[in-house]
Structure formats: C-alpha cells, structure tokens
C-alpha cells in the first residue's frame, strides 16, 4: 500500500486517460489534475450534454475527447475505466495489447486507503446492512466513511483517512 501522495507522484510524466465523467470518476480526475498529471478524459456523451462539467475539467487542464468515437485510439499508458465499461471492450483490449495498464477509481482507493475496509455484497439489503454497520461503528466511537452506491466517492477523502478509520 502507498499513500495517495506517493501514488500520484508515481504518475508524474505518464499519459493517463479516464474513461467516463460519472460521479465516481470526477474526484479521480480532479485529484490527478491537481497533482499535475497529464489527463485525457473520454466520454460518450456530447459536449452539450456535459456542459458545465466539461468546461470545468478543461479549465483545470484536462483534454476532453467526447462523442461516439471517444474510445478510438487509446495511446495513453494508464487507463482508468468507468465501472460501466466492460474490461473486455475491444478498444481496451487493443490498448492493453499495446502495453497500457487498466485501473479504476476504486482500485486506486483500495491501494491508497490507510483505514480498515469492510465490503458488503449480495443481491438485496446492501444499503441497509452497510448503514447498520456504519451506525454500530459510529456508536463505538469510530470515524466512518461510507461509500459505494450510497454516500459519496471515497477517493476524495482518502488523504484525510488514518489507520483507525473505517
């Protein structure tokens, strides 16, 4: 495990692309840009649909590739894919064959989170179970961060987390 600062330092000078401008990838994109990483953001949506979000990321230094051909020619060395894009996508497989590495916002979080992680999986009851676990831990005086499909993307908070956190 490395700290988020160490992880970002390792990306210095590398060409990175983030596929998808959804809720979970926006904190990743901003974190990379603030660290001085050269970031290309790719999304199937049009500029009109992304409006202010596209402008904000460009003002922070991101290069945007939008529209139907957003996955054409992936020359970057590291590709962060959105959870909605299958890892066996032909364009991704081509990029990997050329030497690109695949990652995700959650993978970065798992690699850099100093706290204790609790995963909840299953078909039904995940939100309820997660909420109950969080409340039990809070009642015990623990500092708790809740992520996944409830709460907010945790990568934005990882720099503030310590080993005792959940």
Language-model features and meaning:
Residues 72-74, 83-166:
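Phosphate-binding loop of NTP-binding sites
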Residues 1-104, 108:
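N-terminal leader/targeting and accessory segments in enzymes
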């Amino acid at each position: 495990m490395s700290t988020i600062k160490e992880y970002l330092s390792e990306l210095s000078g590398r060409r990175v692309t983030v596929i998808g401008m959804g809720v979970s990838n926006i904190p990743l994109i901003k974190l990379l840009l603030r660290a001085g990483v050269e970031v290309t953001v790719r999304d199937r949506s049009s500029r009109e649909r992304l409006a202010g979000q596209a402008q904000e990321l460009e003002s922070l230094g991101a290069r945007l590739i939008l529209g139907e051909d957003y996955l054409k020619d992936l020359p970057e060395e590291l590709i962060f894919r959105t959870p909605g894009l299958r890892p066996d996508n032909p364009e991704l497989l081509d990029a990997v064959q050329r030497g690109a590495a695949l990652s995700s916002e959650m993978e970065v979080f798992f690699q850099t989170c100093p706290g204790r992680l609790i995963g909840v999986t299953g078909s039904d009851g995940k939100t309820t179970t997660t909420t109950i676990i969080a409340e039990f831990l809070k009642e015990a005086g623990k500092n708790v961060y809740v992520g996944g499909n409830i709460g907010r993307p945790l990568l934005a908070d990882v720099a503030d987390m310590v080993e005792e956190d959940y």
